[in-house]
């Protein structure tokens, strides 16, 4: 059983709950060991599948399913190879696991056979109201208070950590987990000027319901991905890659992981799955990170184009941070998820929304266009103002359309003018 928990101890409070309720022996017998401490299944850290199973899925391109009681059922979230995820209550998770398939009506079909060879139905194993009440009665707040009274004590390994005695964090150049981020490199300089975006290239042309997990995955790091290559170059073995979520303190890993979800579909490559794109100057297929670095090297600004509900899912700050570090100046979509839109503004990335019935399909965008965003230079930035998008196609023809700038509030205007909310806050502190 994997369940979300913020701290890890040898004897976890929820272990105590299960044991006090008398559930642990029965769960152990069924193979449901309590192993998922911290952010596990809901963030993609539930571990690998057995190798023969992984090979079978990949070789036959199987669409396999999971059943979980967490709060995330995005494609590939529980495991990159698991495309379909069903949310259910914990008892139903156990029931479906016993059945071994989701292609069953568990209200009427048996889950399996008992030792006596007779069919076992969900109604046979479902607890009564009294059984539930009796189990809950064994759990009390004293157990919670007892465990959390020692929340900062930690185990022997925690106590053995050597901490440098310094007023500020001592950065370690060889660390692959925490690196000095570049977000404040130019904080001592003047405020950045808000200017038009000229000659931008499309980094990715995406569809509807692109989640923050598509943008910045939190799960396993593939060995042949840009992040995997970076870690190997640093001497990290693939077995020790850990996950994007665990390495979120290292921007070098996280920017390489941006748009690296194996289930993302870039329409510039015909909608094939994987974090790749078409590098327009040469026509090469490259990892999105590699293409972005080439564009940065020659000073080419970048734009991401998407459909409806861009940025749904977890309010993952790295989905906006990574977008910024790749050199993306604007995201143009049909609609945005509220928090991610705000996070883009907070990282100095311009969220623009198509108007009326216009979208990437009606405009026949291929991703090979050059884009200009006009109306920023020499203009007082105001919430939800209109800007002009100039689309220059491969044949040199141009089309101008109006887009809505989704900087929605006066506070967001100030954040954007400062280069993002991090710069805004730090400049305010310096000024005071």
Model-found features: residue ranges?
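Single conserved hydrophobic/aromatic residue that forms the stacking wall/gate
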Residues: 1-9, 13
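Mobile "lid/hinge" segments at catalytic clefts and subdomain interfaces of large enzymes
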Residues: 15-16, 33-147, 345-350, 381-384
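Extracellular/luminal Protease-associated
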Residues: 71, 293, 297-337
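Extended active-site and interfacial segments that coordinate phosphate-rich ligands
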Residues: 84-85, 90-92, 215-239, 321-330, ...
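Acidic, glycine-rich flexible loop/linker segments
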Residues: 114-129, 341-415
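Flexible inter-domain linker/hinge segments
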Residues: 120-204, 213-215
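N-terminal beta-alpha supersecondary unit
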Residues: 177-189, 198-297
């Amino acid at each position: 059983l994997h369940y979300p928990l913020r701290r890890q101890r040898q004897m976890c409070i929820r272990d105590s709950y299960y044991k006090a309720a008398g559930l642990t022996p029965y769960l152990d017998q069924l193979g449901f060991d309590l192993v998922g401490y911290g952010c596990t299944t809901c963030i993609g850290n539930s571990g690998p599948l057995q190798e023969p199973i992984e090979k079978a899925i990949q070789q036959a391109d199987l669409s396999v399913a999971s059943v979980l009681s967490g709060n995330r059922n995005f494609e590939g979230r529980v495991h990159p190879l698991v495309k379909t995820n069903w949310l259910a209550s914990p008892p139903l998770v156990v029931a479906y696991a016993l059945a071994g398939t989701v292609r069953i009506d568990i209200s009427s079909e048996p889950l399996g056979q008992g030792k006596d060879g007779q069919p076992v139905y969900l109604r046979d194993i479902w607890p009564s109201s009294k059984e539930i009440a009796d189990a809950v009665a064994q759990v009390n707040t004293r157990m919670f208070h007892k465990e959390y009274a020692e929340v900062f004590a930690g185990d022997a390994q925690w106590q053995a950590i050597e901490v440098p005695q310094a007023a500020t964090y001592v950065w370690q150049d060889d660390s692959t987990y925490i690196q000095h981020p570049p977000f404040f490199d130019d904080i001592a300089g003047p405020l950045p000027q808000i200017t038009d975006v000229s000659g931008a290239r499309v980094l990715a042309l995406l569809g509807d319901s692109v989640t923050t997990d598509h943008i910045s995955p939190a799960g396993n790091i593939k060995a042949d991905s840009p992040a995997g290559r970076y870690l190997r170059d640093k001497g990290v073995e693939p077995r020790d890659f850990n996950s994007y979520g665990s390495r979120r303190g290292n921007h070098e890993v996280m920017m390489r992981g941006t748009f690296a979800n194996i289930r993302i579909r870039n329409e510039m490559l015909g909608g094939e799955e994987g974090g790749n794109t078409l590098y327009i100057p040469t026509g090469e297929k490259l990892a999105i990170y590699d293409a972005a670095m080439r564009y940065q090297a020659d000073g080419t600004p970048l734009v991401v184009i998407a459909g409806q509900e861009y940025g749904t899912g977890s309010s993952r700050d790295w989905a906006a941070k990574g977008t910024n570090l790749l050199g993306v100046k604007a995201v143009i979509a049909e609609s945005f998820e509220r928090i991610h839109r705000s996070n883009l503004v907070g990282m100095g990335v311009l969220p623009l929304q198509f108007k009326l019935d216009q979208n990437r399909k009606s405009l026949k965008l291929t991703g090979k266009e050059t884009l200009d965003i006009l109306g920023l230079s020499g203009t007082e930035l105001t919430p939800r103002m209109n800007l002009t998008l100039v689309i220059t196609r491969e044949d040199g023809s141009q089309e101008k359309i109006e887009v809505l700038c989704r900087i929605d509030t006066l506070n967001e205007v100030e954040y954007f003018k400062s280069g993002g909310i991090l710069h805004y806050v730090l400049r305010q502190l310096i000024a005071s």
